[in-house]
């Protein structure tokens, strides 16, 4: 659910929690509240303000990913992705309006849609030979498969992702 942060910048209230490892990137809204409880509320607000400041400084319109590191000296911007981002792919199956539609709405001047999360989602990238998991994924009842149409699997190449959905309430 977006909230105004600075001029025309909207920042999502619920940030997904990300885990990196073994060339896999997971983005999950499951357990977000418990995981975020470990992060000081001031840091969350500082992160939102910093992301809004970056977007304002760039006069940016659209979806943007801003990756931050928590350091002893405070938050540090590590990466700016001025586009829809892998960390938001969970929104395809977890929100009323996903990051792709939000981006289009923003760049053509339409109001942002309802970004409220209706389901918990765990997103898993399919990297390289992970594409071989597709037959098993297709047997999963609550898995939504998103393939990128790449002809050849190579080590480290993103071939697609799967969103595993758990309906709320």
Q: Where are the regions a protein language model picked out?
A:
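Generic structural "secondary-structure junction" signal
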Residues: 26-28, 32, 37-42, 86, ...
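Active-site "cap" helix and flanking loop/linker of ATP-utilizing ligase/carboxylase catalytic domains
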Residues: 45-66, 71-72, 81-129
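Peripheral (often C-terminal) accessory segments that flank ATP-dependent C-N-forming ligase machineries
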Residues: 3, 9-14, 105-169
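Internal nucleotide-binding/catalytic subdomain
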Residues: 1-63, 70
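Surface-exposed beta-strand edges and their flanking turn/coil or helix-capping segments
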Residues: 10, 32-36, 45-49, 90-95, ...
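Short, surface-exposed linear patches
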Residues: 18, 42-43, 91, 98-102, ...
């Amino acid at each position: 659910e977006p909230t105004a942060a600075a001029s025309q910048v909207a920042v999502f209230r619920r940030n997904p929690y990300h885990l990196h490892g073994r060339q896999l990137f997971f983005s999950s809204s499951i357990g977000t509240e418990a995981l975020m409880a470990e992060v000081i509320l001031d840091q969350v607000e500082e992160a939102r303000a910093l992301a809004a400041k970056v977007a304002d400084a760039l006069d940016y319109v659209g979806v943007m990913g801003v990756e931050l590191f928590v350091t002893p000296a405070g938050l540090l911007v590590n990466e700016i992705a001025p586009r829809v981002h892998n960390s938001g792919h969970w929104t395809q199956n977890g929100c009323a309006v996903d990051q792709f539609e939000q981006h289009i709405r923003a760049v053509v001047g339409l109001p942002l849609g309802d970004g409220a999360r209706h389901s918990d989602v765990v997103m898993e990238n399919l990297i390289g030979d992970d594409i071989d998991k597709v037959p098993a994924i297709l047997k999963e009842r609550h898995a939504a498969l998103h393939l990128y149409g790449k002809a050849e699997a190579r080590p480290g190449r993103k071939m697609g992702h799967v969103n595993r959905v758990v309906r709320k309430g």
